[in-house]
């Protein structure tokens, strides 16, 4: 026998490892994953006329060692070659497990920091896909191993994302669809 009992037991332990750690981090929303976002959630610029609403977000099953959370909202299909960041929030305290959503993103918990988006300023802006195209928009919750992310609010979304990935223990994603918007007749 080429492999010994110890080797096989080790493989069995690896297979059961996820069970020993409990359930994975889960992100849920008031909107349904992989479904089209209602138009009233759209931004109110660039040809869109929505109310700029964010959905409620809830997360659970953070891994041991989680010291804070971050939430991002990203258009992975934006015609930029690198997507488009619609919201970046970090330093969400570890005892917070939801954001209520609402107009302009809704309120944030005390201590949370809203970083620059790809508009070059902090805040939230809802989806606004180009006319005639459907885009995939991704909400992500990151469980972080630091209470305070070592970034400044004026960092670009991409640079903040770089630091997020360095400190992410686990993440959960929720993809929503927006569009296609009808072409204007003007």
Where are these regions (language model features)?
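N-terminus-centered regions that define maturation/targeting leaders and the start
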Residues: 21-186
